[in-house]
Amino acid sequence: MNILVLNGINLNMFGKRDPKQYGTITLAQIDEQLDALGAELGATVQHFQSNHEGEMAERIHQAHVDNVDAVLINAGAWTHYSYGIRDALAILKCPIVEVHMSNIHAREPFRHHSVIAEIARGQIAGFGVDSYLMGLRAAVNLVNAAKAG
């Protein structure tokens, strides 16, 4: 089972930006935890981060070509306005799980709306790194349920 984890704009700065919202964990540390959990769950986890919207869209297109089993995405600020990322994700035939370290619904009003939510199977927000770990578990469960038919 292949799970693709996508991290959007500014998320490479985890550990350096706003520790009140995001804690001090780095993206590399999050990736390590996801790899370890993926191994426990029988999933191979691939990681991609970009601060460039076109690069992110191209990686999502490649995920379609590669026929990945599920996508876990934290699009960062793109969550709230990038119809380009949303439309690229809509091409995928696999489950999409949206995750956020902070509770986007308890922050600034512009963060309350996600353009990705309507095409995602679910959204997990506000639990720090555990949002990613719960998201990975959810993605694996969705893939396993689909295979069990």
Curated annotation (Swiss-Prot):
Stored InterPro entries: DHquinase_II, DHquinase_II_sf
Any matching Pfam family: DHquinase_II
Single GO biological process annotation from the record: amino acid biosynthetic process
Pathway named in the protein's UniProt entry: Metabolic intermediate biosynthesis; chorismate biosynthesis; chorismate from D-erythrose 4-phosphate and phosphoenolpyruvate: step 3/7
Keywords: Amino-acid biosynthesis, Aromatic amino acid biosynthesis, Lyase
Single GO MF descriptor: 3-dehydroquinate dehydratase activity
Transmembrane segments: none
Entry binding sites for substrate: 74, 80, 87, 101-102, 111
Coiled-coil intervals, chain numbering: none
Reactions catalysed, as given in the entry: 3-dehydroquinate = 3-dehydroshikimate + H2O
NCBIfam families, per database record: aroQ, PRK05395.1-2, PRK05395.1-3, PRK05395.1-4
PANTHER family tied to this protein: CATABOLIC 3-DEHYDROQUINASE (PTHR21272:SF3)
Functional note: Catalyzes a trans-dehydration via an enolate intermediate.
Oligomeric and partner information: Homododecamer.
Protein's recorded name: 3-dehydroquinate dehydratase
Provenance organism: Leptothrix cholodnii (strain ATCC 51168 / LMG 8142 / SP-6)
Source organism phylogeny: Bacteria, Pseudomonadati, Pseudomonadota, Betaproteobacteria, Burkholderiales
Gene: aroQ
